[in-house]
Amino acid sequence: VLFRSTLWPVNTDIGWYDAVDGQRVITVFNPLWDNYAGYDHAVKLLRLQNVLTKEVETLTPETEEEFGNDPVRIYKGDITISGGYMNIFFMQNLPSSTDNKHRISLVRPQEDDTLYGEDGYVHLELRYNDYDDLTGRRSPGAVSYNLNSLDIPSETKGIKLKLNSEENGEVEVTFDLKTVGSNEKLTTNVDLSNMQLK
């Protein structure tokens, strides 16, 4: 298992990829050697694919309509927290045109006392706006949200995330941050090229 491992890419044929600080990617690779030059593994990169990377936004009465609250299809285990980011994989019901991209947002309440709840959890919502443009064609989607802007206190128990699930309606998912190794899932060959999100 390569979770929480340091990797050294030994192939240099990825010069086409322009790395941007803070940009999350899905990396497909083959492990070559263990314990290589101070890294856990040397790997041959097969593919790098950018993941939509966004900041947490503030939900206000003025932004409520723009963020929407349309249902989204997310399967159990497809929301993870790692490296200061919340990573979400889902099945997008594609819009009719690339000009009509849907919006997916991780939002925080406007008031800090609501964000940092008395229960010891940070309270967030996943919001989706399909702009009433659905084709019934599905494609995998992925998005990562930078949680570092939240200034989460060290005594925080975790994160409670509200979302509108296609399967279960309004639900709340709890992520306990104190459990090492929780909420991790091995991601394999996912093609995000058809995703239509902003």
Model-assigned labels for residue ranges:
Residues E167-K198:
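Short beta-strand elements
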Residues Y75-L134:
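Short helix-loop boundary/capping segments
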